[in-house]
A protein has these predicted regions:
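Non-heme Fe(II)/2-oxoglutarate
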Residues: 40, 45-48, 61, 165-171, ...
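Non-heme Fe(II)-dependent double-stranded beta-helix
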Residues: 1-13, 19-121, 127-130, 245
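Short, conserved beta-strand element in jelly-roll/cupin
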Residues: 129-148, 201-202, 209, 233-236
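Double-stranded beta-helix
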Residues: 146-215
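Feature marks short, surface-exposed loop/turn motifs that line or immediately flank catalytic pockets
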Residues: 112, 147, 162, 236-238
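A short beta-loop-beta micro-motif enriched in histidine and acidic residues
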Residues: 96, 124-136, 195-196, 202, ...
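Short, surface-exposed loop/helix-turn segments at secondary-structure junctions
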Residues: 51-56, 123-124, 179-194, 224-226, ...
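Active-site region of the double-stranded beta-helix
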Residues: 98-101, 125, 130-131, 141-152, ...
């Protein structure tokens, strides 16, 4: 469980480095599964075979790859088990102060050694227009030691209280990643009144939490080490479907506008119920890695 001090830090900054949540053997199992899924690619899965929703290069540059995989858990029992990690799910319930937590989707972020590119500054919530309120907290689990040399995230503490500024962030050129915010003035009533770009290293097997409106991005991987991580995006029991929005996960949502996302079905499993982490589904308790 997180301490009151940690919860207060997250409330103030919109980001928090958490504890170790998976062991070295578990990390290696997930790495092996990631290699298997990437080797298959978007077109390598047989008809009817469980597969991710999407595999893509976020950088759009084959020489500066940033691999993104959405819902790898649907293709891998090992990654599906991670969704139910009680240290993570209990922390999400604490940080949101909500008794019921559901998975929105997961997102692998993989920067290969020596050439993994920049992921520009952004906020998560504006890219999820099918949800209201936006999913509030993401758990980001490192599968390698992540630091500035291999493309760790950078955060702007306090920015989650400034509102939606995705248009401003999208205008920041990639080559000026480390110059963000020189021309930005936070709201006059904001608790934090300056753009303070902060490197965000995370140890292998540890988790980092960030709010869906916190400004964040990541630099190039210039090291000889890969930078592998998975973001677990969660939503609370308050989340509602916005039919006018668009998102890769929308095709799995068979709901009327403004319906509770808690009714969205098997692609959005519940992981906390009435403040208590949900145990592993029976199908996962003895499921082998595929």
């Amino acid at each position: 469980m997180l301490s009151n001090e940690q919860i207060a830090e997250f409330t103030r900054n919109g980001c928090l480095i958490g504890p170790e949540v998976i062991s070295q053997p578990e990390v290696q199992e997930l790495r092996d599964e990631l290699d298997r899924v990437i080797a298959k690619g978007q077109t390598g899965f047989a008809p009817g075979e469980p597969q991710p929703v999407m595999i893509s290069n976020m950088s759009k540059d084959k020489e500066q790859a940033v691999w993104q995989i959405v819902n790898i858990w649907e293709a891998s029992p090992a990654f599906e088990r991670l969704l139910y990690n009680s240290q993570i799910t209990k922390a999400i319930s604490q940080l949101t102060a909500k008794p019921d937590i559901y998975v929105w989707h997961d997102q692998i972020q993989y920067k290969p050694a020596k050439h993994g590119g920049v992921n520009n500054w952004h906020q998560d919530a504006p890219y999820w227009p099918v949800l209201k309120p936006a999913t509030p907290v993401t758990a980001w689990v490192a599968l390698d030691d992540v630091d500035e040399s291999n493309g760790c995230m950078w955060m702007v503490p306090g920015s989650h209280k400034w509102g939606n500024h995705i248009k401003y962030l999208e205008q920041n050129p990639l080559e000026k990643f480390h110059e963000l915010g020189k021309d930005f003035v936070p709201p006059l009533d904001a608790e934090v009144k300056a753009v303070r770009r902060t490197p965000w290293p995370v140890k292998m097997g540890h988790v980092s939490f960030h709010h869906s409106l916190t400004w964040h991005g990541s630099g190039k991987n210039v090291s000889d080490r890969p930078r592998r991580a998975i973001a677990l995006h969660f939503m609370t029991g308050d989340a509602r479907f916005v039919a006018s929005g668009n998102h890769p996960m929308k095709k799995f949502i068979k709901l009327e506008d403004n319906a509770p996302m808690s009714l969205a079905g098997e692609h959005f499993p519940q992981v906390v119920r009435d403040w208590k982490p949900v145990g592993l589904p029976r199908s996962l308790k003895s499921a082998p890695v595929t």
